[in-house]
Amino acid sequence: MAAGRAHRADPVRRARRPAGPAHPGHPGPAGGRVTDVLEVRRAGPLTTVQDLGRPGYAHLGVPRSGALDPAALALANRLVGNPVSAAGLEITLTGCELRPTRAVTVAVTGADADVRVGPRPGDVGRPLAVPAGAVLRIGPARDGLRNWLAVSGGIAVEPVLGSRATDTLSGLGPPPVRDGDRLPLGPWPGPPPPVDVTVGRPPTGELRLTLRPGPRADWFTPDALDRLLGTPYTVSPVGDRVGARLTGAPLPRAVAGELPSEGIVLGAVQVPADGQPLVFLADHPTTGGYPVIGVVDDVSALAQARPGTTVRFHGPQR
């Protein structure tokens, strides 16, 4: 998207993938020779490499990106002895199948799912030993949409602007993971320390989100904000890492003119011409031309909400 242009195209789009045949692997740091890899036997519809993102570049048009639930990825990394900022995999809905070429410790967090190392069952939220050559299978998410996988040593693809995260909107970072990829692994970090945690589960009922009105609430009719805070919305099946679309009572505008393109932040609730709110997630654009009626404090739970989930907004607690 060109700098200074209003973001009026559909903000929810497919991740960019390079043309041509399946690529044999991702380059390791500094293009060095990679010996230990994680082989991808089945990638699923959207599996990406993610860490905690690349903050500090919004003024250059680069969003933070990174894991949609940073706490879930950080927990997975702690469970295997990695730094919390190490890169892992974000797996969407249908699971994946992987095979390491060296013995590793792995941890899966996020949605509840079947996890197996060969024939041996494992658990979400606990470290698992995977011998060299064994197959790790992560089944479909039973609640929520996504899982995060940490592997001892981390996924050591080449960083871009200090991060290994895939940005599906701009194409920065490694491409989305595909069948047959060989993902380089970093050095073994040593045995994982004991971690005493309670693993949270994605919300399965009505989702309540705190909304801070503005900066363009005055572009809407007086009852639009009351409608947003007083009526339920439903998560649409049209959504991805860029944004979560909601359907419900349309939010009518009081100002019909064009809004000059301005900055967009994580959690911004933009209202396109159809009046249906769109909540921007990690791969959001940094500028937009539709008015933003408010900003959601924490989008991690929304990123796990399945289509059909009921969402209610409420104002900040005083």
Enumerate the language-model features and the residues they cover:
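Conserved "landmark" site that anchors the functional core of diverse proteins
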Residues: 1-318
